[in-house]
From Swiss-Prot:
Record pathway: Cofactor biosynthesis; methanofuran biosynthesis; Cofactor biosynthesis; coenzyme A biosynthesis
Gene: mfnA
Biological process according to GO: carboxylic acid metabolic process; coenzyme A biosynthetic process; methanofuran biosynthetic process
UniProt source species: Methanothrix thermoacetophila (strain DSM 6194 / JCM 14653 / NBRC 101360 / PT)
Cofactor entry: pyridoxal 5'-phosphate
Protein name as it appears in the record: Probable L-tyrosine/L-aspartate decarboxylase
Swiss-Prot/TrEMBL catalytic activity: L-tyrosine + H(+) = tyramine + CO2; L-aspartate + H(+) = beta-alanine + CO2
Domain of life, source organism: Archaea
Cystine crosslinks: none
Modified residue annotations for N6-(pyridoxal phosphate)lysine: K227
UniProt cross-references to PROSITE patterns, sorted A to Z: DDC_GAD_HDC_YDC
Length: 383
């Protein structure tokens, strides 16, 4: 049982308490299951500079508000829209909620449905509950991209939004956004792209594909700086092609320095926007290309070494997400955890899921591969 202390502790004692609890957390150098990573040092410094700021009341913090406008503009241009609108959110879940809410509000319906891929993030299940919308899940094709024909089958006159994924959580796959865009335009339905992970990967890959605002039917995109953008948690981005959907989210804020507010949360730390701006300005396109290239090099190395062990990926990796076909994925996962490695699993098909993030080193990856081989040999022998 925890109670409010009668008398406070010294700062040193509080620090010791925090250090002890922090020591129980998993070190990033053993994490292959997370889509988050250590924030860049320049982002950490920027975050600490803006701890006191509140973007929920931007008139009090005009400099911080300008930073957010710049971040939205920069992310919009990265995603193929030079006059985008939006805001810095807490992450992908909030951005997805707000994107669908904007689409629902634009439709004028309160009894609608949305069509998402079966591979969609669980935030869309939360959306069903929060917004009282039916979530229809379209099947995937053999490459684990959404089946556009099934999406078309699920659309009716109550459909308020279509969703495509650019970097699925389990497999890192990219849906055929161009085809979904055409479907959205034909039916007069907005298309939202969840690029929470892929948003800071796809623009920096050598191979380009149509997944962003270049597809005319795309109304909104979720992109998370606190993933491959290397900004501290929580830092998300909700980017709209135009201002109208954002206005559909506004509510009156009579006691603040602005009369209306579109964000889901009221009080919003400006630190996330500042940190995101700092790391973007520091790394630039060239810096992010190097970060992504290194992650893809590790991805290719992992797949090559896995194949040498007789293990194939479920799909050829599109980005730095790998799903390996192993016998008894739960058993392999447990055995790796006993050796200090944190990996996860996919659902269908069941496989070992690995994310090669910037915090992983070549040396630790080779240690992991050695342990993986030992685990597989042991399990095959029944050990």
């Amino acid at each position: 049982m925890y109670t409010f202390p009668e008398k406070g502790l010294s700062e040193d004692m509080v620090t010791d308490l925090l250090k002890e609890m922090r020591s129980r957390d998993c070190p990033y150098d053993r994490l292959l299951s997370t889509m988050c990573t250590r924030p860049h040092p320049v982002a950490v410094r920027a975050y600490s500079m803006f701890l006191e700021t509140n973007l929920g009341d931007p008139g009090l913090f005009p400099g911080t508000a300008e930073i957010e406008r710049r971040v939205v503009g920069i992310l919009g241009s990265l995603l193929g829209c030079s006059d985008a609108t939006g805001y810095v959110s807490t992450g992908g879940t909030e951005s997805n909620i707000q994107a669908v809410r904007a689409a629902r509000n634009s439709s004028g319906r309160r009894d609608g449905n949305i069509v998402v891929p079966r591979s969609a993030h669980f935030s869309f299940d939360k959306i069903a509950d929060l917004l009282n919308l039916e979530v229809r899940k379209a099947e995937l094709d053999e490459s684990l991209r959404v089946d556009v024909g099934d999406v078309e089958r699920l659309i009716d006159d109550r459909t308020v939004c279509l969703v495509g994924i650019a970097g699925t959580t389990e497999f890192g796959q990219v849906d055929p956004i161009g085809d979904l865009s055409e479907l959205a335009i034909e039916n007069g339905i907005p298309l939202h792209v969840d690029a929470a992970f892929g948003g800071f990967v796809l623009p920096f890959l050598e191979k380009d594909c149509m997944w962003d605002f270049r597809a005319e039917g795309v109304q909104s995109i979720t992109i998370d700086p606190h993933k491959m953008g290397m900004s501290p948690i929580p830092a998300g981005g909700l980017i709209f092609r135009s201002s109208d959907p954002l206005r559909r989210l506004e509510t009156e804020t009579y006691y603040l320095t602005v009369s209306r507010q579109a964000s889901l949360t009221g009080t919003r730390s400006g630190a996330a926007a500042a940190a995101t701006y700092a790391v973007i300005m520091h790394l630039g396109i060239d810096g992010y290309r190097k970060v992504v290239r290194r992650c893809m090099d590790m991805t290719e190395h992992l797949v090559s070494e896995a194949r040498a062990m007789g293990i194939e990926p479920v799909i050829e990796p599109v980005m730095n997400v790998v799903a390996l076909r192993v016998d008894d994925p739960p058993g392999v996962r447990r055995a790796l955890l006993e050796r200090g490695w944190h990996v996860s699993m996919t659902r269908e098909p069941k496989a070992l899921r690995l994310i090669l993030m910037p915090h992983m080193t070549d040396e630790n990856l080779d240690l992991f591969l050695s342990d993986l081989e030992d685990v597989l040999i042991s399990l095959r022998r029944g050990g």
